[in-house]
Amino acid sequence: MEHLHTTICALATPPGEGGIATVRVSGPDAYGIVGKIFAPVRQWKSVADAKGYTAMLGRYLLNGAEMDECVALFFRAPHSYTGEDVIELSVHGGTAMADGLLEALITAGCAPAGPGEFTRRALENGRMSLTQAEAVMEVIAANGRQGAALAKSALDGRLAKRIGKIQTALQTLNAHLTAWVDYPEEDVPELSDAAFVGTLTEQKAALDALISGYSAGAVLRHGVDCVLLGRPNVGKSTLLNLLAGFDRAIVTPVAGTTRDIVEQAVQLGSVRLNLFDTAGVREVGADGDAIEAEGIRRSWRKLDEAGLVLAVFDAAQPLSDDDLELARRCQGRPAIAVLNKQDLAGETDVPRGTLEPYFKKIVPMCARDAVGLQALTDAVADLLGTAQLDPEAAQLCSARQLAAATRARDALAEAIAARQNGFGLDAAAVCLTDALQALFDLTGENASDATIEEVFETFCVGK
């Protein structure tokens, strides 16, 4: 960043109306600049003498005029978020007072902070690792408590520690291997195949566990797009209203009431579902309703875009050709068959065996009476993998981390295969070096400037 070593300021709270607005100041001259625009209520106090982890009440000055009441929180380097001197100034919420405070600080010598610049300085000053820095935005953007807990575990350094253990084991192995290859005269004991392959296999398994949990972790943090599909009048809108907790969609006995997509975000257990209630899917002839036909085309498009499909069937009626077409289109997708209107169903109306080849889960329900809701909640969590995920455990929290972990895992797999296929230790050592490089990229120890810029370009100003 252009002014990494200047003193910067930015609004740290959301802009607009609110109880308070907080402006963060960080840098070598933070106390000097704030001292120019902050007048303590107790005049014998001064900003320059303020100790870390203390607060002071005063008013901020703009062009020499007292403006709003202001509370200053002081942090001394290196015991601050950025590792620098930091002061956080809180005034009444709203744009006027916050903008005035920013103007006063910039006039006094502050530079406006860029996106993520405070966290970038924390990284540069050793206050956090790159994986922790990435977790900052994940905590902010997390949907639901478990998603926030998952992101918080990375922010607390659990991911960095877990990767560190893998690195240490591989570095120890690599050092032994290097010594044996490069210094044969030193009588370094040769690694046995069992010890070499065993260590690689153990660390590959650790990476496999991290990689396999990524998708479920992403669901907990960000939610998943979920489409409700089914032929007309099977109860899709009733199910939407049940999940939403209020009448979001119009429900009538008339088939085809929903003609366009209805969107609603809901929390189902630990998972946030971005629901899309769609027009009933059925075969429409060439001379059919053009509006309905367009709604059906949009429904099928949503099927291709969704991360979860709830295919709704009328359990009180035999499966129609339209039902079977829907089932076929759901095959191979993360799809759950919801057998709705179970209260009206006979024993043989919808044979489960007909649907089982196409769906991961089948859930009987009566959406009108909220019967089967817990079973649906459990099925969604199990299908998406969130039921097996420990939100307190270390997890990968970005696509960049996933790519690096995958490269490391694949390199270890190649090293194992090299030994099993009779190649020498020197060939396996090349793969081991590649794995270590990928792990260094993951943690940021050897990350390029381009990688770091990529991480911080997604940050908001003030963080």
Where do the model's predicted regions map?
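Glycine-rich, N-terminal phosphate-binding loop of Rossmann-like dinucleotide-binding domains
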Residues: 26, 91-93, 243, 278, ...
